[in-house]
UniProtKB/Swiss-Prot annotation:
Acts as a negative regulator of mTOR activity. Interacts with FBXW5; TNFAIP8L1 competes with TSC2 to bind FBXW5 increasing TSC2 stability by preventing its ubiquitination. Its main location: cytoplasm. InterPro entries: TNFAIP8-like (IPR008477), TNFAIP8_sf (IPR038355). The gene is TNFAIP8L1. GO terms for molecular function: identical protein binding. This is Tumor necrosis factor alpha-induced protein 8-like protein 1. Keywords: Cytoplasm. GO terms for biological process: negative regulation of TOR signaling; regulation of apoptotic process. High expression detected in most carcinoma cell lines, especially in cells transformed with virus genomes. Belongs to the TNFAIP8 family. PANTHER family: TUMOR NECROSIS FACTOR ALPHA-INDUCED PROTEIN 8-LIKE PROTEIN 1, TUMOR NECROSIS FACTOR INDUCED PROTEIN. It is found in: Cytoplasm.
Length: 186
């Protein structure tokens, strides 16, 4: 029995094409201004923390690739009911996590890196479960790389610490997250 499917082939081609195009120019076309500002600040904070432009670019590129592939899966109706339910849980958890991150920034002495790290790792696990068989091992590795960096307690401590330039990066990230929460785009 031949299991060839044009729809499946087209989806694979789109994923492959998008994985090659995950650059800042493509992000500018596909991402709204607020999201772009948040991603730019996240890139700057990551570059500052890792002291590596290459590592910061890799992390952001992986984030964009995963987001684009997730969008393709949704647009192509590739996810089943259980997977969509997991994705709704992921979105709800990510939204709650964004509110927590903003709150930690706004209210002095409330920051707890363990809370943010645990929430980020929970989001990672939900995303893995939701997209399980639809993405390659390499894409799952990208998910691990992005969430591993974001949940790094040392990175979170630096980001929420009093020192510049992290304080400025965090302020701009939280301002953007606040706008995204208000607009309902997160």
């Amino acid at each position: 029995m031949d299991t060839f499917s044009t729809k499946s082939l087209a989806l694979q081609a789109q994923k492959k094409l998008l994985s090659k195009m995950a650059s800042k120019a493509v992000v500018a076309v596909l991402v709204d201004d607020t999201s772009s500002e948040v991603l730019d600040e996240l890139y700057r904070a990551t570059r500052e923390f890792t002291r590596s432009r290459k590592e910061a670019q890799k992390m952001l590129k992986n984030l964009v690739k995963v987001a684009l592939k997730l969008g393709l899966l949704l647009r192509g109706d590739q996810l089943g009911g259980e997977e969509l339910a997991l994705l709704r849980r992921f979105r709800h958890r990510a939204r709650c996590l964004a509110m927590t991150a903003v709150s930690f920034h706004q209210v002095d002495f409330t920051f707890d890196r363990r809370v943010l790290a645990a929430g980020l790792l929970e989001c990672r696990d939900l995303l893995h479960q939701a997209v399980g068989p639809h993405l390659t091992a390499k894409s799952h590795g990208r998910i691990n790389h992005v969430f591993g960096h974001l949940a790094d307690c040392d990175f979170l401590a630096a980001l929420y610490g009093p020192a510049e330039p992290y304080r400025s990066h965090l302020r701009r990230i939280c301002e953007g997250l606040g706008r995204m929460l208000d607009e309902g785009s997160l």
